[in-house]
Amino acid sequence: MKSPRNSPDSSFSKDENPIIAGPSLKMYSQSTPHPDFWLYDGSIVLSVESCLFRVHQTILANHSEIFSDLFTVPQPAEDAEEMMEGCRIVHLPDSESDFVDLLNAIYHPECALLPLTLVVWLVSNHLITFHFASYFDSISADADLETVLTFIQGILHLSTKYIIHYLRQRCISLFLTKFPSTLDGYTLKAGASNREKYKSDNVMRAINLARQNNVLEVLPYAFYCIARLPHKRILKDRTMDISWKDKAMCLVGRERLKWAQTSLSHVFLLNFQRAPLCQSSLCAFARGPHSEWHVLDCMKSPNPLHAYDNWDNLNVCADCVAYCKLRHMKGREEVWDRLPDLFELPTWNELRNAQNM
């Protein structure tokens, strides 16, 4: 249930704005109470940029050890009189928009142990219900990458900074829907009917966001996406791009992806081998695999994770097709396992462990 809220305009008149009510509050004359998070029963006022938030100290402290410690640390003597409507004022050096996103996530928590709709009672033959929804439910399941990054950016940054584990994990889970950390996740994403084609700027934004907030699991596949871009785009110097060190590693990784495609995932085309149970001597002379390899090799960028599906073009027996599928599957699995190493990153497990420290 939402906490009662008052719009600033409904709490004080224009002539009696508490922001400028006393001498000690003159510094807040340019600050504005937030319309959604100036709660009449709030116990602490947080000053973030030019905005004031009157919220519940215990709620924030229960979500974050950092907030708990912050609120219990005595203020310097010169700050002792910084009060507003009986509430202590605490300054936070954060972004106003990021903090609004964080408060939305905290004040609209997920009720994980309850159904979306909880039946409360029956009155006059009508069911009275409450609906429990998380702030994260407000983003569509098929939202594009840019929308997801904008949605999680502030929450991820502040939940990492203030050690709010469950919100950080929700952001990471959303992040991984766009940059999977498992081959199954990649296969599910790649096979979707509404598969999204990422813009290069958004992928670079994702890498920067991941690095800033220690979300290391997303890096291997994000680097994979950058490595497949045209050289001209990678070498462009744009303000919000990834570092030149990361760009250099993506260019090196691009060459390694070519090797992985040739030697691992699609080796069944370049180095065709008959199935052990093959009964047709014609398969040994089939030209289909080599022809398919030349088509693949002419592609502009390597894509060793791509699932090959033109099996009829091989013109070999069913046993040989099954054997090729097995080699292809094992090759893709090996590419995925090696993906971090192709970009000079630690192993998948090491990335996860470092991310969760």
Model segments located where?
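Acidic, serine/threonine- and proline-rich low-complexity regulatory tracts
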Residues: 2-7, 11, 180-357
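Amphipathic alpha-helical protein-protein interaction segments
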Residues: 53, 60, 91-95, 141-148, ...
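Short, structured motif recognition centered on aromatic/hydrophobic residues
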Residues: 53-55, 99-107, 117-133, 152-156, ...
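A cross-kingdom feature marking solvent-exposed beta-strand/loop segments within repeated
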Residues: 68-72, 76, 111-122, 138-154, ...
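A low-complexity, Ser/Thr/Gly/Pro-enriched, surface-exposed linker/loop concept
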Residues: 72, 76-85, 251-257
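Eukaryotic helix-linker segments that join adjacent hydrophobic helices
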Residues: 80-84, 93-100
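A short alpha-helix capping/helix-loop junction motif
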Residues: 147, 170-171
